[in-house]
Amino acid sequence: MKIIRKNKKDKERREQYKQAEQMKNMYKMLRRNELLDQETRNYFNMQVTSSEKNSSISRIKNRCVETGRSRGIISAYRISRLRFREYMKMGLISGVKKRSY
């Protein structure tokens, strides 16, 4: 299966976030610690603000793992609503039926 550029980029961002998350949380905790002097707290504040943009959770966008589509994602399956509908009609997704009123 061909890797879509957007999916590759998103995967890289997820990896960067995963690597930086623990250190970033530690710096945030130390930044809020009132037992430390102001200079030390300012240092940790700089560490948090100078981190990479791609290591932020807000840069991560849910995308369809097959098409790279960013809208209409069914998060439980990580595919777009269009692919979900196709697979549902073919019977590839168990336990899901078309709804009728």
From Swiss-Prot:
**Where is this gene product found?**
Mitochondrion
What SUPFAM superfamilies does the record point to? Answer: Glucocorticoid receptor-like (DNA-binding domain)
Quick one: signal sequence residues?
none
Among Pfam families, the record links this protein to: Ribosomal_S14 (PF00253)
| Keyword terms, alphabetized | Mitochondrion, Ribonucleoprotein, Ribosomal protein
Q: Name one GO biological process term.
A: translation
Q: Its GO CC terms?
A: mitochondrial small ribosomal subunit
Give the quaternary structure.
Answer: Component of the mitochondrial ribosome small subunit (28S) which comprises a 12S rRNA and about 30 distinct proteins. Interacts with LIAT1.
> What gene is it encoded by?
mrps14
Which Gene Ontology molecular-function terms are recorded? structural constituent of ribosome
Question: What protein am I looking at?
Answer: Small ribosomal subunit protein uS14m
Q: Which protein family is named in the record? A: Belongs to the universal ribosomal protein uS14 family.
Which Gene3D superfamilies does the entry mention?
1.10.287.1480
Q: Which PANTHER family match?
A: 30S RIBOSOMAL PROTEIN S14 (PTHR19836), SMALL RIBOSOMAL SUBUNIT PROTEIN US14M (PTHR19836:SF19)
Keyword Ribosomal protein carried by entry: yes
